[in-house]
Amino acid sequence: MFVVGQRWISESENNLGLGIVTASDNRTVTIQFPAAEEERIYALSVAPLTRVQFQKGDRINSVEGWQLDVEEVVENQGFIIYLGKRADSGEEAVLPEMQLDHKVSFSKPQDRLFSAQIDRSDRFALRYRALQHQQAQFQSPLRGMRGIRASLIPHQLHIAKEVGQRVAPRVLLADEVGLGKTIEAGMILQQQLFSGRVERVLVLVPESLQHQWLVEMLRRFNLKFSLFDEERCSDFDKADEDGNDVSENPFDSEALVIASIDWLESSPNRAKQVLASHWDMLIVDEAHHLAWSEDEPSVGYQFVERLSKQTPAVLLLTATPEQLGQESHFARLALLDADRFYDYHSFIAEQKDYKPVADAVATLLNDKPLSHDEQNSIAELLSEKDTEPMFKVINSEKSKENDRLQVRQELIRELIDRHGTSRVLFRNTRQGVKGFPHRVYHQITLEMPSQYTNALKVMGMMGGVTKDDQLYPERLFQRMNPAAKWADFDPRIEWLITFLKNHRDEKILVICKQADTAIALEQILREREAIRSAVFHEKMSIVERDRASAYFAQMEEGAQVLISSSIGSEGRNFQFASNLVLFNLPDNPDLLEQSIGRLDRIGQKNDIQIHVPCFENSMQMVLATWYHQGLNAFEETCPMGAALFREFGEELEGFLKNPQAVGFDEFLVRTFKRQQQLKAELEQGRDRLLELNSNGGEVAQALAEAIAKEDNNPHLVNFALSLFDVIGLEQEDLGEQSIVISPTGHMLVPDFPGIAEDGTTVTFDRQLALMREDVEFLTWDHPMIRNGIDLITSGYIGKSAISLLINKNLPAGTLLLEAIYMVETQAPKGLNLTRFLPPTPVRILLDNKGNDMAAQVSFAGLEKQLKPLNKQMANKIAKMAQADIKKLIGISEQKIAAKLPELIEKASQDADSTLSAELHRLTSLQAVNKNIRSDEIEALEQQRIESLKQIALANWRLDSLRVIVSNKE
């Protein structure tokens, strides 16, 4: 049976490669596996081995590296010799089986079937379902938005969908604080990455926000960005023996990069390297800090300007236009489209033209009759439409309410499309979005301890008292008395302990200036008072912060209080808590708003209680009073806070240095009066038309509801659990809608992407994921699911199977063939053809006469009737029925070839319809809205042409097959 020199493969250890018989006797056979450098000795009676014999038409590899197209197979004294022509030269050649490549693998399902590499039937089923789900996800309009670890906020989803599906989007995101600009940018980015339009991304942020972006992108979107600074870049600096610079560009080493714009401004060489690298998308946060004037733009602005000109997609995140001032606002728009926004004075004139229209929209929204002037403004802008009948419906008391509503909505839609900046600017306000809680301020006045008073006096006599020393005296005291403990006498500690004991059932966030303060506070609460507490600061790793956050989020056994440094809490939101204690007061209004913003977010269910313990007649008290009575910054968001701080900062400094100085009350009155004036100007400057476009209305609400509906669909849970089971991952149900997934020693793959060695806790529940940042939130967009699908569909799992069909109506031994074909295109990713023709599985189920029964016999229905076969019996069937199986495969190829034109035609119609409609819309709008870029229209037309061309080239391939043999029982 076995002859030395023959080639066999191990059925149980496919990874060993092609074996060669080195010895054989009456009881055993010895096989050498050169590729794996392994040897096995098998008992002849149970040897799990299959003889390798290629067929005419196969292309096989020699051990020397050349390939042979087999034309004839000759057997001589137990050895196989292959005759044919070399693939490289076409010359006739002979290849004895001993000279076959040792690393042979069988990728075609039929080759695997006939070489005894037969998989379990349940794995074949999982593979088919994975292919079906992959197809569905490629075509889902929710892709890139549903997987975010965040609440489903309609206006955010609307902006993300509107911008994320554009070709090379260039927009300004200018929502008010707390409305989620970072989340909007992340969802836009996610969609662009999924579609393949974007691969390399640069995020430029102020230095203080680098870690916030790193955390947000990882925790909310599962995007692993790399933080670049001078230390990291210096590792790439090199010189040759002659001292010539041969450095590599560090920015070419990663695809997703975060860098500080402050650093690049001060480092021309690094800025030059950034410009030399290629980026598909640029995101700039806090873009309003890029100073610009017509005569003297800043270094930072000029750098971003150069970068934006060579980067196709640009997202600028900025303060609201009213906060910026029109000149600064114009400068940001010019970064997005320099051809459109080329002259500031023309821009101002154009904006004035839209003011009457915005007023008219406000009237439409309030369901009031339009004035004569408002009608003229609308008619002028919609000059190509007959608006007179529409105005009659709106202004007539006899009109039906539903008719008035429809006309109002149509007019508003038309006006939005023609709005001056509606395609490049999105801005939502809290007033427009609604759903925010109230904020209630509680000032706690305490007597300053003598230890602090003495320390300030001593340092004052030495001439070394700083503003920080007076605002945060505990740091000064500790610096002067390293052995002493400020917490032993600071009355804020006792107040905090009492407060916590009086609010045992509530979650409380405490924010301090420094990490050391937070650490000391947490230790006292935990050790001295046995209060369940967690600490959160910048010295902790992201994993440690996740654990602290999760401990705080637990409702029953979790921490009552989380004590955080001001930097440590960046990027983290705790909407489930409604009590905020500012142990240290931030020293500017923006930082104050950031701190309150940890709780004051969309999704907060309760009014926010803000507690500020201050020392009487101190700098702390002056600042707190100015924030409250001057800016009203505790109880309302204060978008004009930075402007007021600049305007009154110098005068405020005098009162901070001398808390009892005369004139403070009058100063508060002046500040508040100016605050009210700026607030009124902001309200008057609100562009209701722009807000309406940014908000999304009913369409946005429907989008949120669609994702919520998918959240509750059991298909993902069922598929994921089957996936984990087949791969060999251990699953432990923790209750509370979470499970722990752990690796085992019998997995199909060495490691599964995203699973930690000690296990990973996952949930399919969005609300739990929002509360527990240490738990992975699984959706169809999550890398664990996407990688799992790729693992199944791109490998050999489930490619060939043999099953037993128990059916009394069929003669025993009846042969069926279930073939799964893939119809797909080989097109550039940037075309995003998967929307129209994703890799599409086509199931063909042939009986022994070659009839396709797939339409009559469902996959799920057939699956229930199938029984597994042991491997030995499956191999026997494959060998015995080889000729019949090959015949059925040939028939199935004819069937799929006949189906292909219909699939191509449908995909072509979908692509042409979708892309032509968008093209027509943009072309029509360009005539009435200058913000429709010509290059965007040209790119879309080119995309349409290329898409139709590539879809026409789609082809099929056999992905997997299952042989089914019937039996009576």
Curated annotation (Swiss-Prot):
Protein EC: 3.6.4.-
Enzyme class: hydrolase
Family named by the database record: Belongs to the SNF2/RAD54 helicase family. RapA subfamily.
Record's protein name: RNA polymerase-associated protein RapA
InterPro entries the UniProt entry points to: Helicase_ATP-bd, Helicase_C-like, Helicase_RapA, P-loop_NTPase, RapA_C, SNF2-like_sf, SNF2/RAD54-like_C, SNF2_N
Keywords linked to the UniProt accession: Activator, ATP-binding, DNA-binding, Helicase, Hydrolase, Nucleotide-binding, Transcription, Transcription regulation
The Helicase C-terminal domain, residue ranges: 492-663
Binding site for ATP: 175-182
GO molecular function: ATP binding; DNA binding; helicase activity; hydrolase activity, acting on acid anhydrides
Subunit structure: Interacts with the RNAP. Has a higher affinity for the core RNAP than for the holoenzyme. Its ATPase activity is stimulated by binding to RNAP.
Superkingdom of origin: Bacteria
Domain Helicase ATP-binding: 162-339
GO terms classed as biological process: regulation of DNA-templated transcription
Parts of the chain that traverse the membrane: none
Record-linked Pfam families: Helicase_C, RapA_C, SNF2-rel_dom, Tudor_1_RapA, Tudor_RapA
Role, per record: Transcription regulator that activates transcription by stimulating RNA polymerase (RNAP) recycling in case of stress conditions such as supercoiled DNA or high salt concentrations. Probably acts by releasing the RNAP, when it is trapped or immobilized on tightly supercoiled DNA. Does not activate transcription on linear DNA. Probably not involved in DNA repair.
Gene3D superfamilies per record: 2.30.30.140, 2.30.30.930, 3.30.360.80, 6.10.140.1500, 6.10.140.2230, P-loop containing nucleotide triphosphate hydrolases, Tandem AAA-ATPase domain
Organism from which the protein derives: Actinobacillus pleuropneumoniae serotype 7 (strain AP76)
Residue positions of motif DEAH box: 285-288
